[in-house]
Curated annotation (Swiss-Prot):
Record's protein name: Large ribosomal subunit protein uL18
Protein family: Belongs to the universal ribosomal protein uL18 family.
HAMAP family xrefs: Ribosomal_uL18_B (MF_01337_B)
GO biological processes: translation
Superkingdom field: Bacteria
Database matches in InterPro entries: Ribosomal_uL18_bac-type, Ribosomal_uL18_bac/euk
Cited function: This is one of the proteins that bind and probably mediate the attachment of the 5S RNA into the large ribosomal subunit, where it forms part of the central protuberance.
Organism: Clostridium botulinum (strain Alaska E43 / Type E3)
Self-association state and partner proteins as the record states: Part of the 50S ribosomal subunit; part of the 5S rRNA/L5/L18/L25 subcomplex. Contacts the 5S and 23S rRNAs.
Protein's UniProt keywords contain Transferase: no
Molecular function via GO: 5S rRNA binding; structural constituent of ribosome
Amino acid sequence: MFKKVDKKASRTKRHLRVRKKVFGTPDRPRLSVFRSEKNIYAQIIDDVNAVTIVAASSLDKEFSTNGGNKEGAKLVGAAVAKKAIEKGITEVVFDRGGYVYHGRVQELAEGAREAGLKF
């Protein structure tokens, strides 16, 4: 018999496996990505102090036209990078959140790189 694969559970397991290795420090914080069906969210987190330093999402007013599509994801990546550079952060560790590095997640990463963040 075939079992139906629970995509959310497998993503959560993947994320936990990746999070064992990916850790954000004050010098090099973690860029975390969350992708919902309609929107995309990114935040830069210092795991040592358990503080979110910078956050951006496709729900912000300036992204109302694109939403969570690829173009919107690229703009969110650029916005989070711009806010991070204003706070003096230039290097981050990329946490794809258990998602495949493809599509919207990839566009967010490329947008952040083009805006000046180093992974």
